[in-house]
Amino acid sequence: MEETAPRKGTVTQRAIERITAMIREGELEPGERLPTERDLAVRLGISRSSMREAIRALTVLGVLEARHGSGIYVTRLEAGDLLETFGVVADLSRGRQLAELLEVRRVLESTATALAAARITPEALALVGTHLAAMDASDGPEEILAHDLAFHRAIAAAAGNETMAAILEGLSSRTFRARVRRGHQEEGAFDRTRREHAAIHRALAARDPEAARAAAAAHVGAVEEWLRTRPED
């Protein structure tokens, strides 16, 4: 009986897995130039076309980067490199995937706020308070929302986990638009948001991680419920 030739997609996926394993195990270091497409294909025992597709896919994902006239390099991955990927995923999500992302955001935001309560410096707490006061003093939705985002960014930064902050930043683009719509469509939405933010700030000032976690979960949960019942077009 003749053996069935492997599907091209399967071969390409195997190449992707092999390259990522080489990076994970330190065989290819961040910033290092990849061997030529031909040499890498021979090394992994696959066709050049499958190798080309694997490299293209990893470049789109940000794992590899093409430098004109120089070759393909392993990206020097930093926490901030997660921003664009998570932002695109958040923007394109619908249905079940959106619901799952909202759950992820609620868990991460609550955890980040709890960490911030334990780690926040007086300077960082003052910055959070500045944005809270600016929200209270503002009347325009756009200005309020700008300080809203800055409020959450300051808390994420105070948590001291750059990767968590990067993921949360990437997940905020959809939430930003949702807050705009919520502010325009629901009477009293901004007042509720102000109260929720004040509760978070009080917990941070008290250096109470569990109170901070609960306040953040309640705040994000309100936005989450609103998004669940009013999906974007």
Regions found by a protein language model. Name each.
Residues 18, 111, 115, 154, ...:
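Amphipathic alpha-helical segments in well-ordered regions
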Residues 1-108, 114:
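Short linear motifs at protein or domain termini
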Residues 30-32, 165-168, 213:
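Short, hydrophobic secondary-structure boundary micro-motifs
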Residues 123, 162-163:
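Cytosolic histidine kinase catalytic core of two-component systems
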Residues 79-154, 192-214:
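All-alpha effector-binding/dimerization core of bacterial HTH-type transcriptional repressors
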Residues 20, 132, 136, 150-152, ...:
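C-terminal all-alpha effector/ligand-binding and dimerization domain
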Residues 160-162, 207-208:
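Short loop-to-helix capping motifs
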